[in-house]
């Protein structure tokens, strides 16, 4: 039973037939636009015409709205005292005064300065990181450049070995130059001529036969 009662209590409230008394008072003063201020009677008449209100019951709430409006500064009492007299809209309703705007402007300036400082710090950090990366890359390039000449020096001895290979062929050339030695043997052939001379000398024996 208690749960059912709670559910019944949670039903949405009916919307009010009119706005709050303070809102109706402000609407009445803005609509009347009287230079000398709007009287309490004129405000009540405007509310009675434009809103579905029991003006007798609402009169007390209208008086309270006028008094609280003057205390808060939303309304200015031009004439009279309390809830009687004439009323105008206060400066707070029309807009913030210069004294109130100054702190807001100062706060905005501080926030803007903080944002700028944060951006500058981030930019400085990013620049420092970029410079470090650039320095590392430059150091790597220099180490690579130093290592390259060492590789060239290692290749040079191989070229010298290739140059020494023709020196091994020189002994073959000497052998080819030594081949003319058999030509000397051919030059010794005049010995055969000597044998022919000996054969030519044989007729001397014939001379002995003649004797």
Curated annotation (Swiss-Prot):
Q: Where is the composition biased (Basic and acidic residues)?
A: 95-107, 114-123
Task: Give compartment(s).
Answer: Nucleus; Chromosome
**GO terms for CC?**
nucleosome; nucleus
Organism (species): Strongylocentrotus purpuratus
One of its GO biological process terms is: chromosome condensation
Tell me where it mainly resides.
nucleus
Q: Mind telling me what this protein is named?
A: Histone H1-beta, late embryonic
Residue ranges, annotated region (Disordered): 1-22, 81-211
Amino acid composition bias (Basic residues), ranges on this chain: 124-177, 185-211
């Amino acid at each position: 039973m208690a749960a059912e009662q709670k559910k019944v209590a949670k039903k949405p409230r009916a919307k009010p037939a009119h706005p709050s008394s303070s809102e109706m008072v402000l609407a009445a003063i803005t609509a009347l636009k009287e230079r000398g201020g709007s009287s309490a009677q004129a405000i009540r008449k405007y509310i009675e015409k434009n809103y579905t209100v029991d003006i007798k019951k609402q009169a007390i709430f209208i008086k309270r709205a006028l008094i609280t409006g003057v205390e808060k500064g939303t309304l200015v009492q031009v004439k009279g005292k309390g809830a009687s007299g004439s009323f105008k809209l206060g400066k707070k309703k029309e807009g913030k005064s210069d004294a109130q705007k100054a702190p807001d402007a100062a706060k905005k300036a501080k926030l803007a300065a903080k944002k700028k400082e944060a951006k500058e710090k981030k930019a400085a950090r990013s620049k420092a990181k970029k410079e470090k990366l650039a320095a590392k890359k430059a150091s790597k390039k220099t180490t690579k450049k130093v290592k390259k000449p060492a590789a060239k020096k290692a290749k040079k001895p191989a070229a010298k070995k290739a140059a020494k290979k023709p020196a091994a062929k020189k002994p073959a050339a000497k052998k080819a130059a030594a081949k003319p030695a058999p030509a000397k043997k051919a030059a010794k052939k005049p010995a055969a001529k000597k044998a022919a001379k000996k054969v030519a000398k044989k007729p001397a024996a014939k001379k002995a036969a003649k004797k």
